[in-house]
Amino acid sequence: MPLLLHPRFPSSHAAACAHRAAAAHRDARPALRLPELHATRRRRNNVACRATRAREAPPQQQNTAAALSKEAHKYFDHAVVTVRAGDGGHGAVLAMPASPSTDAPKSPRRRSDKGKRSGVKKVSYKRNYDGSVALPMGGHGGDVVVYADEAEETLLRFHEKARYCAKRGGNVGATGTLSSRMHNGFAGETLRIPVPVGTVVKRKKGAVLADLAHPGDEVIVARGGQGGISLIDVPEYRRRKAMVLSPNIMRDVSDRVLIHGQPGEEVSLELILRVVADVGLVGLPNAGKSTLLSAITLARPDIADYPFTTLMPNLGRLGGDPALGALQFSSEATLADLPGLIEGAHLGKGLGRNFLRHLRRTRVIVHVVDAAADDPVDDYKIVREELRMYNPQYLERPYVVVLNKIDLPKAQDRLSSLAFEISSIGCEECDGNNTSEDSLNGNTGEHNTSSETKVEGGEKELRDYPRPQAVVGASVLKHIGIDEMLKEIRAALRKCFDHRLPEP
């Protein structure tokens, strides 16, 4: 007959067998060494605090930073950011101060009390224009302002941080009983965001807010929320008397929503950088534009013998005209070295559309042509045609053609023929009254297809636009013909300046 097991009888034969089997299984397990035992006991969960997680950039952010460093020319002039103004501060629910005439216990008057009461000062509150008590309000939320700063050069930093928030307004400093010492909540600090000079600020897929073309220009892009009001909470039998002091009486529990501040505005902005320059240098890659800029200004752009060395516009300052003498004044001019243009740039090839839009503010255009190339005239026509296809008003501005690299033998032999052939492209009568005021001042639309670009029989061609103001030969590397080139550039600038002067 089998032996029955029962938990109340652990000393039974079956229980003893089970105990021996468990001990044998425990002895069969490999013994842990001392270091492994300590490591097992000290095993902890890795918990990272918020500051540690903030310092460790996520992989997506690291990839963005790598793309910005390698391909900065694709992002330097365009960015989309989100800004949020500060919320308004909260008001408070206040109680009326106790009235000594009604709340104090009655006691027989004495002559000594009469003198003491006469010295008690009455509480005075701030009043509104209608005589009511001015209750404290929550602070106004901080606004968001975008302003033009000369220290900023590109919009690259907005790709690393694309959201900006202003501080909220402060709450009413005290709660409880209404007192004359209460004050409004502190206003939130205005958030000022610097951008490069020449940045166009517009709502994303919306209207243009401002064109920050001059240093110090600014625009409020988001306004902070209004602070909440304060309410007086009094019993119903005292409301009529309290209405004399202030109309802000809490009549119901639902009125508490009035003490909350209003939320600040949140908008998505599109920032577009258009270089502010008086003179724009254009040409095919490796024509010598960067070398020319470094020869006549203090700018030091990257210069190499391979195409597309310049991927972002370089700026330089051209000094005043020394030929005017000490009694006359000539302001400095800003030159912009644009990246090289290729055929089909107006369609976006080689980021041409991004580069061509930086000519919008220029008043004078300088065409830099490699005189030692296989066909310099055809190179000149390619660039002119790209300007015409992108914005026809670019061709109506005064321009100078610089035949560069004349120190080479191939360019010296045909310099005079090249200058004659290029100067003959265009019409003579266009040099006068047909040049629009907007094109001289650098105020052109992005894509102007008005009736001015039409002639009888169709659109204008290159021969229907003005001829160059001058065609000069130079070698900016050998400093040959620099003075003559500067003379013609300053003459073109003077023409634009004289056109803006009002008639006496």
Curated annotation (Swiss-Prot):
Compositional bias per record (Polar residues), positions renumbered to this chain: 436-452
Keyword Nucleotide-binding applies: yes
UniProt xrefs under Pfam families: GTP1_OBG, MMR_HSR1
Basic residues bias spans: 107-122
Keywords associated with the record: GTP-binding, Nucleotide-binding
Start-end of Basic and acidic residues biased regions: 24-39, 453-463
OBG-type G domain location: 277-494
GO molecular function: GTP binding; GTPase activity
Cross-referenced InterPro entries: G_OBG, GTP-bd, GTP1-OBG_CS, GTP1_OBG_dom, GTP1_OBG_dom_sf, OBG_GTPase, P-loop_NTPase, Small_GTP-bd
GO CC annotations on file: mitochondrion
Domain Obg intervals: 73-276
Described function: May bind GTP and have GTPase activity.
Family stated for the protein in its record: Belongs to the TRAFAC class OBG-HflX-like GTPase superfamily. OBG GTPase family.
Record's protein name: Probable GTP-binding protein OBGC2
Species of origin: Oryza sativa subsp. japonica
